[in-house]
A protein has these predicted regions:
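Acidic, metal-coordinating helix/loop segments flanking the phosphotransfer/catalytic sites
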Residues: 55-81
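Two-component/phosphorelay signaling modules centered on CheY-like receiver
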Residues: 35-60
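The feature encodes the CheY-like receiver
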Residues: 89-90, 121
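Alpha4 helix (beta4-alpha4-beta5 surface) of REC/receiver domains from two-component response regulators
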Residues: 42, 95, 109, 120-135, ...
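CheY-like receiver
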Residues: 7-15, 155-198
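Short amphipathic alpha-helix used as the core "switch/output" element in two-component signaling
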Residues: 92-109
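C-terminal output helix
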Residues: 141-154, 162
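Active-site residues of response regulator receiver
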Residues: 80-87, 117
């Protein structure tokens, strides 16, 4: 098994040249309702060298933590990245993403978010991205996957788009060109039907 610490320090996030990352000053918020999963992700992040890890057990608590750390424009203790679970009581990951992307404070609205889900399908990725997730991971998350996606949002952030009813990172879809076309394919009805099937 690869050492997660060396994985995070040596991953290039898609580049051919290796980079070294100093993540000691980074602050990551984990929003996860299962304590075991939250602790597992915390220990992986510590192995990567992340200096500050904050946990919340539901979307509503996540909002409180984000507001506390990122609500003040002059704060030096901002959360840099949010890892959030999709399905949780008291505010799920999609609700939290919608709140973040609709927030009036840029320090919250542009915060990178990695959505985690136990369901592996293209539709999960599409719905997650439609709600503003920068990246989507399938649980159980490996150290390699987490390090790769974390460094990707740090090193190669997606440009943000504003469209009617949507603000968030560009999904970089391969099958639809820019040219002003609607790039999002999930409607509220699609999301409702998806939740009914779970």
């Amino acid at each position: 098994m690869n050492n997660p610490a060396s994985t995070a320090q040596n991953l290039s996030a898609g580049n051919k040249q290796k980079k070294a990352y100093s993540l000691a000053a980074f602050r990551v918020l984990i929003v996860e309702d299962f304590p075991f999963m939250a602790d597992l992700m915390s220990s992986m992040l510590r192995e990567f060298g992340i200096g500050h890890i904050v946990q919340a057990s539901c979307g509503n608590e996540g909002k409180e933590m984000i507001t506390m750390f990122n609500g003040d424009a002059g704060s030096h203790n901002k959360i840099d990245v949010v890892l959030l679970d999709w399905l949780m009581p008291n505010g799920d990951g999609l609700d939290l993403l919608k709140w973040m992307r609709g927030n009036s404070k840029d320090s919250i609205r542009f915060m990178p978010a990695i959505l985690c889900s136990a369901y592996a399908s293209e539709q999960v990725v599409t719905v997650g991205r439609d709600h503003g997730a920068n990246e989507v991971l399938v649980k159980p998350v490996s150290a390699q996957q987490l390090a790769s996606r974390l460094l990707y949002v740090i090193d190669k952030p997606r440009p943000y788009l504003k469209a009617p009813g949507f603000f968030g990172p560009d999904r970089r879809r391969r099958d639809e060109p820019y040219k002003g076309e609607e790039r999002r394919v999930s409607t509220e009805e699609d999301i409702k039907q998806y939740h009914e099937r779970l």
